[in-house]
Amino acid sequence: MAQITAKLVKELRERTGAGVMDAKKALVEVDGDMDKAIQYLRDKGMAKAAKKADRVAAEGLTGVYVNGNVAAITEVNSETDFVSSNDKFVNLVKDATKTIAEGQPADMEAAKKLKMDDGSTLDQAFVNATATIGEKIVLRRFALEKKNDDQEFGAYQHNGGQIGVITVLEGADAATAKHLAMHIAAMKPKVISPEELDDQFITDQLAVMNHKIDQDNESRALVHKKPLPHLVYGSEKQLTDDVLAKAKEDIKAELKEEGKPEKIWDRIIPGKMQRFIDDNTQVDKHFAVLSQDYIMDDSKTVGEFLKEKGAKLVAFQRFEVGEGIEKKQEDFAAEVREQMK
């Protein structure tokens, strides 16, 4: 039987990232054969990963990497936020994002087959990480953005990588591209312009906003305040010429009822029309970046800011860790009882 030296154990750990006891056990099992020990750990890692496959991984980090005219953004999940601050996990996110930016895979299956710098596939790297770190580690999603030489990338990560953003701007400098990425990180838009918003999405969001108005009105009633009206429209897509014409006629009728002289209506109507438009484009302001108030200067919208700069937002990607994942609520006492069995 081969002697399992500390040097052998160290070498195996460096090549696989395995713990001391796992590395030693692997070498003992294969009588000191390094290649077989690596395969043993790999098989063991796949078995561990399979056992963890049904677990919910909703913590983690985003990764952002720019490689010339290609930028990649990823979300890598772990089960706990403690693991997401682990150096091995952080480095895996960086390496995986770099690999995707350089490999430019068409989909997740292609991404899993990409080779990392150490020669392992991306898929194997995540299997190994699950085995080594002891939690389910998964590449949840990625996106690629490309630009030409006349365009600029903006890349930004917020809150230690909990949010990642890539922007592609035309006619802008790097600072403007990054500032817009910071705005997008904070304001959570879904699309660039209102035209991209789905009609059903607008309807659904109006229902949510009107429900909030109902809740506010309950509080207002307690202090005898006038209730707020429901929103009828949510997007400029819905403000047709007929809708705007009717709004203008309603304003005229209101001014007449108030006894305002007709000769001053032309000075009042534009402001009231703008107020009508502002009140009835709330879905745009929440979800279309060009319609949002610019976070660096809320006296103007993002669209107005970019127009002043002579710039155009071509594309953006925003990832936030855990978006859309239902996190498992842990019963700590039950977990301890389970471990004591």
UniProtKB/Swiss-Prot annotation:
Q: Which InterPro entries match?
A: EF-Ts_dimer_sf, Transl_elong_EFTs/EF1B, Transl_elong_EFTs/EF1B_dimer, Transl_elong_Ts_CS, UBA-like_sf
Q: Which top-rank group of organisms is this from?
A: Bacteria
Q: Which Gene3D superfamilies match?
A: 1.10.286.20, DNA helicase RuvA subunit, C-terminal domain (1.10.8.10), Elongation factor Ts, dimerisation domain (3.30.479.20)
Here the disulfide bonds are: none
Gene Ontology, cellular component aspect: cytoplasm
Predominant place of localization: cytoplasm
Cite the entry's keywords alphabetically: Cytoplasm, Elongation factor, Protein biosynthesis
Q: Does the keyword Electron transport apply?
A: no
Q: Which Pfam families match?
A: EF_TS
Mention one GO molecular function: translation elongation factor activity
Instruction: Quote the function comment for this protein.
Output: Associates with the EF-Tu.GDP complex and induces the exchange of GDP to GTP. It remains bound to the aminoacyl-tRNA.EF-Tu.GTP complex up to the GTP hydrolysis stage on the ribosome.
Describe the family membership recorded for this protein in Swiss-Prot or TrEMBL: Belongs to the EF-Ts family.
Q: What is this protein called?
A: Elongation factor Ts
